[in-house]
């Protein structure tokens, strides 16, 4: 089966989608059209990728009959565009976050169920080879009991992001990965945010997540740091994993502690610095792997790895982080105290 794919949105991320789709074997994937309201941007995409272009995505869908539509538009348009596509019974890949609000996401899930269409959400870090290898190691028991997750997703302010802050735009990546590697849901959150550079939205988030299996996650996310860092550490009884999303590297720092029957000595030890191991990772482009998964899901008639339900779960946690921030005590009042919110 050859899957016909159309893309809505030809901005910075949309161009990445078009590039990846063009790299597929045409016997498996056919790029049938791109829709973009800004005509100079549309013409550039048409010229570069030799694809039919439309200023009206509805007309594109009517004329190209796609099996899958990638929704790569600003977040505030996700709901409107995806709802229109799903109502036609067409599968969608929605760039993260799934929508701005839980109500919008629930509406998408409902129409998808009614029309028999699939929703995939572009939490692309799930397909990062470093995350894939990390999950494989965890399934093998390399870490033992998991204690703690710490995500650092920091870097300069991107002017192209105008309609959302770091919690929805950046932290959603790490929330999704944490749910995946912890293999548990979040039950409590606490957060603090600040707005320093962005004109309307928060550009700094510090958040705590407590999972149902008692693992604690830390989110350190901002658009204020003059260098780009994308890292996750996972600490457990046998050591600590460190993954670098940008370089797709995975390191394991072994806890060299050797159990002993001497209770007094045991109370003084428990963790000891050991060997650092660099794991072998086959590097690949996460977006391409994401498309491979979504296309295979269509052909095999199964759910994609990152489903609409996953997107909704992440959005619920994002909302809880926002509510936690709002319940804190602000400037001019008494020092802020921790507010724990049940998810």
Q: What kind of feature is each model-predicted range?
A:
Residues 17, 51-110:
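Beta-loop-alpha module in the N-terminal Rossmann-like domain of NAD(P)-dependent dehydrogenases
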Residues 99-161:
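A contiguous active-site-proximal alpha/beta segment in oxidoreductase catalytic domains
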Residues 175-253, 281-302, 321, 337-343:
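Contiguous beta-strand/loop segments that form the cofactor/metal-binding neighborhood of enzyme cores
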Residues 1-48:
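N-terminal Rossmann-like dinucleotide-binding module
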Residues 55, 94, 119-121, 243:
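Hydrophobic residues in well-ordered beta-strands that form the structural core
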């Amino acid at each position: 089966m050859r899957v016909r794919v159309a893309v809505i949105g030809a901005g910075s991320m949309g161009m990445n989608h078009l590039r990846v789709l063009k790299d597929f074997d045409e016997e498996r994937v056919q790029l049938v059209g791109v829709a973009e309201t800004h005509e100079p941007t549309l013409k550039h995409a048409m010229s570069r990728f030799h694809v039919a272009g439309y200023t009206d995505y509805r007309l594109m869908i009517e004329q190209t009959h796609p099996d899958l539509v990638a929704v790569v538009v600003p977040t505030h348009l996700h709901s409107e565009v995806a709802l229109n596509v799903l109502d036609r019974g067409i599968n969608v890949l929605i760039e993260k976050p799934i929508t701005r609000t839980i109500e919008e996401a629930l509406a998408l899930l409902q129409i998808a169920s009614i029309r028999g269409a699939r929703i995939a959400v572009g939490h692309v870090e799930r397909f990062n080879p470093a995350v894939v290898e990390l999950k494989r190691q965890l399934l093998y028991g390399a870490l033992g009991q998991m204690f703690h997750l710490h995500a650092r997703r920091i870097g300069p302010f991107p002017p192209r992001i105008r309609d959302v802050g770091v919690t929805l735009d950046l932290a959603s990546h790490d929330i999704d990965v944490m749910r995946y590697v912890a293999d548990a849901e979040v039950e409590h959150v606490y957060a603090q945010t600040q707005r320093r550079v962005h004109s309307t939205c928060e550009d700094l988030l510090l958040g705590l997540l407590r999972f149902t299996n008692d693992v604690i996650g830390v989110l350190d996310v901002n658009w204020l740091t003059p260098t780009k860092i994308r890292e996750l550490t996972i600490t457990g009884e046998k050591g600590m994993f460190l993954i670098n999303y940008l370089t797709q590297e995975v390191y394991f720092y072994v806890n060299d502690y050797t159990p002993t029957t001497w209770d007094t000595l045991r109370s003084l030890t428990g963790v000891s610095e050991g060997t650092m191991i660099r794991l072998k990772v086959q590097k690949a482009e996460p977006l391409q792997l994401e498309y491979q998964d979504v296309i295979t899901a269509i052909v095999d008639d199964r759910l994609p790895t990152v489903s609409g339900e996953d997107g909704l779960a992440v959005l619920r946690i994002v909302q809880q982080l926002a509510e936690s921030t709002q319940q804190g005590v602000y400037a001019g009042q008494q020092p802020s105290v921790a507010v724990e919110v049940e998810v």
